[in-house]
């Protein structure tokens, strides 16, 4: 018989640096899950990734207080800032203060967007790379990035 699921916890944790401090500790503690067990398992799975890269994770909590977790690909904003040469250590999604008003903070090419689309394809809600690139173009413009090519 399958275990009964009691809930899901969605977090965005820097790769290789999960620790019991907020936001991880309180989120898992509310569900009665072993915080250190998650931190060790997460850090082991993300050891090969760039340290500090924001990794979305979905934790499934079961009635017997066990859990499983699934790693997603980093947010689009992280890849766009990296492609444009911006500081990726700032909070996720930060770009231009006034996007679309003429002030751009960087430039990305369609080739870079296609490369990002290939990486993000499994997490995006689209069928082909061309539509994924269009979604990424919109995200880039809303961040204040200029799309070239």
From Swiss-Prot:
Protein's UniProt keywords contain Cell membrane: no
Cellular component terms per the entry's GO annotation: cytosolic large ribosomal subunit
Alphabetic keyword roster: Methylation, Ribonucleoprotein, Ribosomal protein, RNA-binding, rRNA-binding
GO MF assignments: large ribosomal subunit rRNA binding; structural constituent of ribosome
PTM: One or more lysine residues are methylated.
Highest taxon of source: Bacteria
Gene Ontology biological process terms from the UniProt entry: translation
InterPro entries referenced in this protein's UniProt entry, alphabetically: Ribosomal_uL11, Ribosomal_uL11_bac-typ, Ribosomal_uL11_C, Ribosomal_uL11_C_sf, Ribosomal_uL11_N, Ribosomal_uL11_N_sf
Pfam families: Ribosomal_L11, Ribosomal_L11_N
The protein's role, per its UniProt record: Forms part of the ribosomal stalk which helps the ribosome interact with GTP-bound translation factors.
Family, as annotated: Belongs to the universal ribosomal protein uL11 family.
HAMAP family to which the protein is assigned, alphabetical: Ribosomal_uL11
Subunit (UniProt): Part of the ribosomal stalk of the 50S ribosomal subunit. Interacts with L10 and the large rRNA to form the base of the stalk. L10 forms an elongated spine to which L12 dimers bind in a sequential fashion forming a multimeric L10(L12)X complex.
PANTHER family: 60S RIBOSOMAL PROTEIN L12, LARGE RIBOSOMAL SUBUNIT PROTEIN UL11M
Protein's UniProt name: Large ribosomal subunit protein uL11
Source organism of this protein record: Azorhizobium caulinodans (strain ATCC 43989 / DSM 5975 / JCM 20966 / LMG 6465 / NBRC 14845 / NCIMB 13405 / ORS 571)
